[in-house]
A protein has these predicted regions:
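Bacterial N-terminal signal peptides
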Residues: 9-18
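A common structural junction motif
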Residues: 188-195, 287-295, 403-413, 639-647, ...
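Hydrophobic, small-residue-rich alpha-helical packing segments that form membrane-like cores
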Residues: 197-202, 218-219, 223-225, 236-237, ...
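M16 family metallopeptidases and their MPP-like homologs
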Residues: 50, 55-68, 77-79, 95-188, ...
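Proteolytic maturation boundary segments
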Residues: 21-49, 276-317, 322-323, 328, ...
């Protein structure tokens, strides 16, 4: 299905006033797979709940029905910026003295309104200096990141938020025994928020905006949206906002925006996990019941969009590989029936396996790449196609091929069985998604934002099963007209519209790690019923056996649903045989004597099963996944392909050309270039050369080389993992019946990449023409794995480098605004022969490079010490370990990871016991021993002409590398 399939349920209830045990009446839906309960408070706040007791935790989302489409036209990006500011605290936390702080915050608010009216550059600089000075004084009272500390104390993970066109959503994953504290914190956060730390957080938004200007796919989509939605904010406004508006923010507008939309009758609390609904509702009533509703919410009104009668083409430029994007305007989520048919239409065209375009364009190697989606938002949807050219192919040729496939939707040139197969795959997808608390709760979010009755979402499958081919073709003819689309060519070139937002000078604010609000102290001292940790017992939680030939068989029963995963692991990868990656790509285009390549895709899709064959550096993994009843038939298809694939020299020739073009395209991608630089830094040029084929070697490969490598590998000794609903005996028999094992398979010798040791400082510079630099700082002193180091590593990483409460985030982003993204950690080896390695990363603007690197080096070597921050990190670790549960396939994977290190028991148990007795002095001693005064390889990816090369040379001898050096081709 083209967009995430979601289910949601609602429960409205009245609190019974009599009796000490409150009872609630919920809105439910018969046949709802989530057994959802929905309750509505008197103030309009909705609570969506689904119980899942697999782990003692809850995924929580607080969804506000407001997004960038609701931003004032003169201050776009406001909803997104407000999302950032909602992490800054309230009158009760985030400050040591709100009464003393408030006059300065009021003054800052007024000064920003004055700042917005200034146009003279010198006047603006002078006024911003005043704002900065007052902000610094206010920071002496504020307590940055106290919200994050609160979440750490209660053991929350995944603390974050996001803003889109239609929604702003705040997320936390909390222990089941912390519901009361979570509700207390969130209620105060939403009812009594305070805007503080405004100008430093604005710096983070500047960074986010500047980075977004280099995202070529976003440029193309914005170009298309401007045509499809010429009257609606979907096409007029962007989520982050315009550069001009970000330069002239208004705190007053933000507060007015919050007062209008952040009200209980515009909010839903959506949860999934281990909890009692009655008790949960009682807690929500207790803390959120006082929240005043807004009966007059000002919602968006807009004129209907004009009909598009002829194609509109636009061109955008950027550094990434070329592509073409095509979009049609379609019905939004509020038009449930039409939107759902659009989902089926999207999957008939493209499903990643057997859709029309999958087979006609991708499998047939007519274009370099393709994907499509029916992107449905509440007000409107859009049907999007994206195509990448092959070498020598024009974007216009790609356009014509894609439009031809859409034409087949209109004429009905496809088998109706494809619709039936699509429904079966949607069912499987839903079943898999509902294993996750996050997906379950997000289903509620989407239903609420779209204004649906939960019954319509809960029973969606019943309607989808009735969709006919006629409905599909009618929908395509109505909404995917031959001339009613917008198109964006994304070409390689300098973007004339990029105007980097210059960062104003700011004074680093005080971090005040020694301070703590009374509110935080009360949460820290609150008593909750302890949850005892449960560590996996591999003698009870799984089973081990042997198949023929001594092949190890690992078994875990799926107690949740009927999905089965079969996995075969071979200890050989691209480090041993760099042909394997291309070999498996080649195999995916081939058929067998009894099935064509296209028929294989169709048969697997019809079975609602999927497979993957992939080679990593040290292992090759074969996976088959689907319903238990079909898994054997799917395994037969894959095994037949592995051993009986029919070579095709035409396919191989095209594949080689595509591989070379993909390599050229990789050198255009900032992310791919940085990934290659990191591999070079971590492992060195010898590893790159050994595990990478040259272009000449690729061109010389034959079918016999590639298919022979696969066949040979599959005759070697390996491991088989099974996770499914069958009992062990039946599962073992199924594998033996459908998986071919050679007689006396030869064991494989494990060969793993070893991180290179650093014997002196060195700087590596790799060119990439962008306004942002990516930076890696790496050190390896050759220390080998010792499980007794685990508690120290865990404590140090949590205190210093991971999360928004850690030193790195506070110093690099919160206090100084030097980086949008920064992290650091000491990484543990994955196998005994490898080493511990220290890793640090920064992504920021080129003009901040020197300040960012200097500050990073300072905090790494002179780690700030705070007893209060340490206690928060310690509480977070213990709470997370108490509620962590290793389940499902994770049991088998953890067993293998531990075995690779020579261990047989969970490492978490020792960490849990040791951390309870650790002190800040232990962390300091660990930092002195393991981190301080290391020697590093510094890797920079960026535009060297923007860098302070004199400063960079002080880090160590400078070596200029080419992209060919780091990629190995």
């Amino acid at each position: 299905m083209m967009r995430k399939f979601i289910l949601v349920a609602t429960f409205a209830a009245a609190l019974l006033l009599s009796g000490s045990c409150a009872k609630y009446k919920y809105e439910t839906v018969k046949g709802d797979p989530l057994k959802t309960k929905i309750y509505t408070l008197d103030n309009g706040l909705k609570v969506y709940m689904t119980v899942n007791k697999e782990t003692p935790r809850l995924q929580t989302y607080i969804a506000v029905r407001v997004g960038s489409k609701d931003d004032p036209h003169e201050t776009t990006g406001l909803s997104h910026y407000l999302e950032h500011l909602m992490f800054k605290g309230t009158e009760s936390f985030g400050t040591s003295d709100y009464e003393a702080e408030k006059p300065m915050l009021d003054q800052i608010r007024s000064l920003f309104e004055e700042y917005r009216t200034k146009t003279d550059p010198q006047e603006r600089i002078a006024l911003y200096h005043v704002i900065d000075s007052i902000s610094y004084e206010a920071s002496k009272i504020a307590i940055p990141n106290e919200y994050d500390k609160l979440m750490s104390i209660i053991g929350s993970t995944g603390s974050n938020a996001f803003t889109s066109n239609d929604m702003t959503v705040y997320q936390e994953d909390i222990p089941s025994n912390q519901i009361e504290n979570w509700a207390k914190i969130q209620a105060d956060r939403f009812i009594h928020p305070v805007i503080r730390g405004f100008h430093t957080e604005l710096e983070a938004v500047y960074e986010e905006k500047n980075m977004s200007l280099t995202e070529d796919d976003s440029k193309a989509m914005e170009a298309i949206d401007s045509v499809l939605f010429s009257r609606h904010p979907y096409g007029i406004q962007t989520t982050i906002g315009t550069q001009e508006h970000l330069k002239n923010p208004s705190i007053i507008n933000i507060e007015n925006h919050r007062s209008n939309f952040y009200v209980p009758n515009n909010v839903a609390i959506c949860v999934s996990g281990d909890f009692d609904p009655d008790s949960f509702v009682q807690t929500i009533e207790k803390y959120f019941g006082e929240w005043e509703p807004n009966p007059g919410i000002k919602t968006l009104t807009y004129e209907p969009e004009p009909q598009i009668t002829k194609p509109v083409e636009k061109t955008v430029y950027g550094l990434d590989a070329e592509f073409v994007m095509i979009g049609w305007r379609t019905p939004g989520d509020r038009d449930i029936l039409r939107s759902e048919v659009g989902e089926i239409v999207g999957s008939v065209l493209y499903n990643g396996a057997a859709g029309l375009a999958d087979l006609d364009l991708v499998q047939a190697q007519k274009i370099g790449g393709f994907y499509a989606m029916n992107y449905s938002r509440p007000d409107y949807g859009e049907f999007l196609l994206v195509g990448y050219p092959r070498e020598g192919q024009t974007l216009e040729e790609v356009r014509d091929l894609m439009l031809e496939e859409v034409g087949r939707l209109r004429t009905g040139d496809f088998d109706e069985d494809l619709i039936k197969s699509t429904i079966n795959n949607i069912k499987l997808s839903q079943m898999a998604q509902f294993e996750s608390n996050g997906r379950r709760a997000m289903a509620f979010v989407n239903s609420f934002i779209s204004g649906h009755n939960w019954k319509d979402d809960a029973l969606q499958l019943n309607r989808l099963e009735k969709v006919t081919k006629t409905q599909v073709t009618d929908w395509a003819n109505e909404y995917l007209g031959a001339n009613s689309y917008a198109l964006a060519y994304k070409r390689i070139g300098e973007d004339p519209n990029i105007d980097k937002i210059a960062a104003p000078a700011i004074t680093p604010i005080e971090t005040n790690r020694h301070m703590q609000s009374d509110f935080l102290t009360s949460i820290q001292n609150s008593e909750v019923s302890p949850i005892e940790p449960v560590f996996p017992d591999f003698t009870k939680d799984m089973a081990r056996d042997e198949l023929t030939g001594g092949v190890e068989f690992l078994y875990k029963k799926n107690e949740i649903n009927d999905i089965t995963s079969y996995v075969a692991i071979f200890d050989k990868g691209t480090q041993n045989d760099p042909r394997l990656d291309l070999a498996f790509s080649y195999l995916s285009y081939l058929g067998t004597p009894t099935r064509s390549a296209g028929q294989i895709k169709k048969d697997m899709y019809s079975l609602a099963c999927s497979y993957s064959l992939s080679a990593g550096p040290i292992q090759t993994v074969a996976r088959v996944r689907g319903l238990e009843e079909n898994i054997g038939a799917a395994m037969d298809i894959v095994e037949d392909l592995v051993f009986n694939a029919v070579p095709d020299t035409v396919v191989l020739s095209a594949l080689k050309a595509d591989a070379l073009k993909e390599r050229a395209d990789n050198k255009l991608s900032q992310g791919a270039c940085f990934s290659a630089l990191q591999d070079y830094v971590f492992y060195g040029p010898e590893f790159i050369a050994k595990s990478t084929l040259s272009n000449e070697q690729i061109l010389s490969l034959t079918s016999e080389d590639l298919l022979g490598a696969i066949k040979d590998l599959f005759t070697k000794k390996h491991e088989v993992l099974y996770y499914g609903p069958s009992e062990e005996v039946a599962a073992r028999k199924m594998v033996m019946d459908h998986h071919k094992i050679a007689d006396n398979p030869e064991p494989l010798v494990k060969e793993r990449p070893i991180h290179r040791q650093v014997s002196g400082n060195e700087v590596l510079l790799v060119p990439y023409d962008a306004n942002q630099f990516y930076y890696v700082q790496y050190s390896d002193r050759g220390e080998k794995f010792d499980v007794s180091n685990d508690p120290g590593v865990t404590m140090y990483n949590n205190y210093f480098g991971s999360g928004m409460n850690a030193i790195v985030f506070q110093e690099m982003r919160e206090a100084r605004g030097l980086a949008y993204s920064a992290r650091a950690s000491l990484n543990t080896p994955s196998y005994p022969e490898d080493d511990y390695m220290f890793y640090a990363f920064i992504a920021s603007q080129n003009d901040k490079l020197k300040d960012a690197v200097v500050e990073f080096d300072r905090i790494i070597n002179q780690m700030p010490e705070s007893e209060k921050a340490f206690q928060v990190a310690k509480a977070s670790i213990l709470s997370q370990l108490r509620t962590k549960r290793v389940t499902g396939m994770g049991v088998l994977n953890q067993y293998l990871s531990l075995r690779d290190l020579g261990l047989s028991e969970s490492r978490d148990k020792a960490v849990f016991e040791a951390v309870q007795n650790m002190t800040l002095a232990d962390v300091k001693a660990f930092q002195e021993k393991w981190i301080k005064n290391r020697e590093y390889i510094y890797g920079f990816l960026g535009r060297e002409s923007d860098f302070d090369t004199e400063f960079i040379s002080t880090l160590g001898p400078v070596k200029h590398l080419t992209l060919e050096d780091v990629f190995g081709y």
